[in-house]
């Protein structure tokens, strides 16, 4: 086996000052934070109005309040407030779902009818 001689020298120190050692260091003060930024340039405002009138639009809404003891059923009939609306698909919606297979389902769900079984009211 071939044994290579080990390095007997020590590595260079880590705390070298600028200009010492065999590596080139940056000039003194490089990367230091400046004392103060230069003053800003003054600018002149000529002919531009500084005050703009503000316009506030105030809208009022009519809020319908229900009595505290009323129960609102999701999907309930707004006419009789007793029945629950049932969905049914129209003939045209089913036809388009078959003919335009992947995209026809959008038409099928867009063309459905909702009907109340209690009062018979139809909603589209």
UniProtKB/Swiss-Prot annotation:
InterPro entries recorded: BRI3
Subcellular locations according to the entry: Lysosome membrane; Cytoplasm, Perinuclear region
Main location: membrane
Keyword vocabulary terms for this entry: Cytoplasm, Lysosome, Membrane, Transmembrane, Transmembrane helix
Record-annotated membrane-spanning stretches: 66-85, 91-111
One GO cellular component term noted in the UniProt record for this chain: perinuclear region of cytoplasm
Protein topology in the membrane: Multi-pass membrane protein
Superkingdom classification of source: Eukaryota
Family named by the database record: Belongs to the BRI3 family.
Function: Participates in tumor necrosis factor-alpha (TNF)-induced cell death. May be a target of Wnt/beta-catenin signaling in the liver.
Quaternary data: Interacts with BRI3BP. Interacts with MGAT1 and IFITM3.
Name used for this protein in its record: Membrane protein BRI3
UniProt source species: Bos taurus
Lineage: Eukaryota, Metazoa, Chordata, Craniata, Vertebrata
Gene: BRI3
């Amino acid at each position: 086996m071939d044994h290579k001689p080990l390095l007997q020298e020590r590595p260079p120190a880590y705390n070298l000052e600028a200009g010492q050692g065999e590596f080139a260091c940056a000039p003194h003060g490089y990367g230091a934070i400046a004392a103060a930024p230069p003053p800003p340039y003054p600018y002149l405002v000529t002919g531009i109005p500084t005050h703009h009138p503000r316009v506030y639009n105030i809208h009022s809404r009519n809020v319908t309040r229900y009595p505290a003891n009323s129960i609102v059923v999701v999907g309930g009939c707004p006419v009789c407030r007793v029945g629950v609306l049932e969905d049914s698909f129209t003939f045209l919606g089913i036809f388009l779902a078959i003919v335009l297979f992947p995209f026809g389902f959008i038409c099928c769900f867009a063309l459905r009818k909702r009907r109340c079984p209690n009062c018979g009211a139809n909603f589209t």
